């Protein structure tokens, strides 16, 4: 219902295409097929499906989305595909050959392009992530592909490299604490900040919930709960929101978190003619 209502709102706003951004690669094949089909039936608009291959199963989700009627999908050249990148575009094209959705793309030409990027990638080998295989754990922690490698580097910089499983677990716990918010830049960074903060300070989800425990939350978390990045459809969990913002029942102006608002409405006007 959430996705269909969001699509209807976008359609009323005048969009020409609906883009489904599966940041973590957590949209499994059956869900991808049903979602794309429902969006097309509801709006009649073209649907573009984007995902990441952290799980190793994203190509199946892309093919299912195509089966559901997707008009555009994202893939990566063979040499740059897989893991936290997009699924293999060459494999997707090959899988569709001979069927109703045959792309007509010349795979020999694609391979020539891929060979170029294979050479270019070698130049950046010293900066490659140490991730060597996909992980189904992404279905649990829901960490966006664009954040996964960066957060591992942050963990290493903080001396938490050997505690990465704890960081991933904390990420999942923070997501639940925050009310299962949409995790994409910049909100995903806030979830990551809090996960690192919890592991570095040996805090559990119960510790964060405990009203008697004083916690100096990271500034990015305070900013999120102030609504500076927007508000989720159902708001933030009230008890945690009051704790993060330091709401005090003894002071009427601080007794409750702020009501939802559009952050841009509070910005000073800008004269674009200047």
Where are these regions (language model features)?
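Active-site beta-loop-alpha junctions enriched in small/polar residues
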Residues: 1, 21-25, 50-56, 78-80, ...
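Alpha/beta enzyme core
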Residues: 1-47, 63-70
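Glycine-rich phosphate-binding active-site loops on the catalytic face of alpha/beta enzymes
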Residues: 22, 68-85
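Active-site/ligand-binding-proximal alpha/beta "capping" segment
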Residues: 29-43, 114, 118-150
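Thiamine diphosphate
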Residues: 53-65, 75-77, 90
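C-terminal helical cap(s) of enzyme catalytic domains, especially alpha/beta-barrels
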Residues: 81-104
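Phosphate/diphosphate-binding loops
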Residues: 102-117
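Terminal or standalone catalytic/regulatory effector modules within metabolic enzymes
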Residues: 132-136, 142, 146-274
């Amino acid at each position: 219902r959430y996705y269909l209502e969001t699509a209807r709102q976008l359609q009323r706003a005048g969009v020409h295409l609906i883009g489904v951004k599966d940041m973590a690669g957590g949209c499994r094949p059956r869900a991808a097929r049903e979602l794309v089909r429902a969006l097309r039936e509801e709006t009649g608009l073209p649907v573009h499906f984007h995902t990441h291959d952290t799980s190793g199963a994203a190509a199946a989700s892309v093919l299912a989305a195509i089966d559901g009627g997707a008009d555009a999908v994202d893939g990566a050249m063979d040499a740059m595909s897989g893991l936290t990148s997009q699924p293999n575009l060459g494999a997707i094209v090959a899988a569709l050959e001979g069927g109703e959705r045959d792309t007509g793309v010349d795979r020999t030409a694609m391979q020539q392009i891929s060979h170029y990027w294979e050479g270019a990638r070698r130049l950046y080998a010293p900066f490659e992530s140490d991730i060597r295989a996909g992980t189904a754990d992404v279905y649990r922690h829901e960490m966006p592909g664009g954040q996964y490698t960066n957060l591992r580097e942050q963990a290493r910089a903080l001396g938490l490299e050997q505690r990465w499983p704890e960081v991933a677990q904390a990420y999942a716990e923070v997501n639940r604490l925050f009310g299962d918010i949409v995790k994409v830049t910049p909100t995903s960074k806030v979830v990551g900040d809090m996960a690192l903060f919890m592991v570095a300070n040996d805090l559990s989800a119960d510790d964060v919930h405990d009203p008697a425990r004083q916690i100096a939350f990271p500034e990015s978390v305070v900013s999120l709960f102030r609504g500076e990045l927007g508000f989720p459809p159902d708001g933030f969990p009230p008890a945690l929101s009051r704790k993060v913002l330091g709401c005090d029942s003894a002071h009427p102006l601080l007794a409750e978190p702020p009501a939802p608002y559009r952050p841009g409405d509070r910005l000073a006007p800008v004269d674009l003619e200047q």
